[in-house]
Amino acid sequence: INFIATILKLRRPGLKLMQLPMYCWAMLGTSILVVLSTPVLAGTLILLSFDIVAHTGFFNPSLGGNVIVYQHLFWFYSHPAVYIMVLPAFGLVSEILPIHSRKPLFGYTTMVFSIMGIVVLGLVVWAHHMFTSGTPPWMRLFFTIATAFIAVPTGIKFFNWVATLWGGKISLNAAMLFSCGFIINFVLGGITGVALAQVPFDVHVHDTYFVVAHFHYIVYGGSVFVIFSSIYHWFPKFTGKMLNENLGRFHFIITFIGFNLCFAPQHWLGLNGMPRSCLLYTSPSPRDGLLSR
């Protein structure tokens, strides 16, 4: 609420909304998601606590409750939580790329509207996590379409980032390398996300390592790479001291290669039916998951 109030009401005189840095827009969108989705999770946990401690029947089928209701409430928060983690990274990348490509950010207005589009659509796609939970056909159709549409504002942002780099005087320092690594990883994660939005494919790979790979390409390949990029970009501004660029480039190389060696094979494992969240497997193959290990 403080972020929203500050951005909307406490700007300096003469600073219009469409003149804000992209990171401010990203934090505005993130804050809206937090305000709208987190109370649902809090209420759900309170009801679940009553079920456990006081033996009420909100979600207990033997007492007249419904487990599917719990899933809806849980995912109503937990899918926007992904965007809560990723939207600030979008804002940071939008600040870093223009500096190290020595060009203004391409398509500022469309970047703003794409953030708000992600916020709106991010609140109406939660049930794509529940395609195997007995959801009716009309619900599957709606959430498939809504999930596919969220690729549109996300794609706009990526095209604008590439257009920002195009023709620029790019400095391949550690901050830029990690930002470019983020773009590559997040595009791959986004492609698998569109695939998971399709009901037949999702039913096939649900609860397999394909989902693990998709999640990590979004969260680690997205947010964590941008955290590293931001450290290399702002550390000199915070401290007045430069970090070693050779070590930074080496950090990027081993992180990028190691990350992809770990999680890219998991797509293949999931397509072949390897379930996640299992400690032991009945017929382990020495080849399965060798690189992931």
Range-by-range predicted roles:
Residues 2-22, 44-61, 65, 70, ...:
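Juxtamembrane membrane-water interface segments of multi-pass membrane proteins
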Residues 281-288:
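Conserved small/polar residues in nucleotide/adenosyl-binding loops
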